[in-house]
Amino acid sequence: MARGRRLKSYLDYENALGDGIGVGYGQSYQPWLRAQDVKSRGNRSIVFGLKTFRNHHLLSSVESNFFYLAEFNDSVIDIREQFPLFPLRLTQQIANHLHFQHPMVRGVRGVPVEVLNVMTTDFLLTLRTPEGGLRYKAIAVKHNESIPEREAQKLEIERMFWQLIDVEFQIYVGSELNNVVGKNICWATSVLRDGSEFYDKYPLDKILWKLKPDVYPIVGLRAMISSIFGVDAQEAMMLLQAMIGLKMINVDLSYPILETGLIKIISNDHW
């Protein structure tokens, strides 16, 4: 993993913005904080985005879970993680208004002036509306509903920041159900993230016609795909994952697929 970047002074902030960090959208966006820039806050990961075509830096298992849920949502067209809240004077004014201490940079030796820390929102989503327009939603990710007082203060600064610029703000709290759904999406889409599109050479309609809504054992589906296309078990499993990940098959993601060995097909492109 690459070395962490230094963001300890106002000059550092200016240089980062000049390098395009924290600005832009889609493939060009660079998160303000990367996995290597922060001390461990859980299971950090870097995941290639199927919609953005860039690496996403996710700082905890709950962030990863939310990312998979958001990416799988057809309305979401862009995901910007670790989004910086600029200008600093606005978050400072909000903190002063609320009589809260603004987050400060810590542990900088030889710096006589206190430096305001750049606050970030875990995710800024761009969504396509039913009418064809765009809207934005800011998401703060939390492990559970029990939030310490200081954390709640920072969340209130964050909420008011987005309110002032007319962007919806929401707190996402991890749950067992969402963890199961996210894990299933992660599994199904993992075969798509290298961009190889290996599935294109197979006439998948031959499979889809056979998959009426029902509950199927994975081993049976894998054997059927192997038989029809003459591929080994690993390739057959990858094709099954691709059909789910590409939403050719609509399956019930609310129970653990790999743990149960079962897939409940709700519908597909032909049924």
Residue positions per predicted region:
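Electrostatic, structured charged patches in enzyme active sites and in nucleic-acid/phosphate-binding
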Residues: 1-271
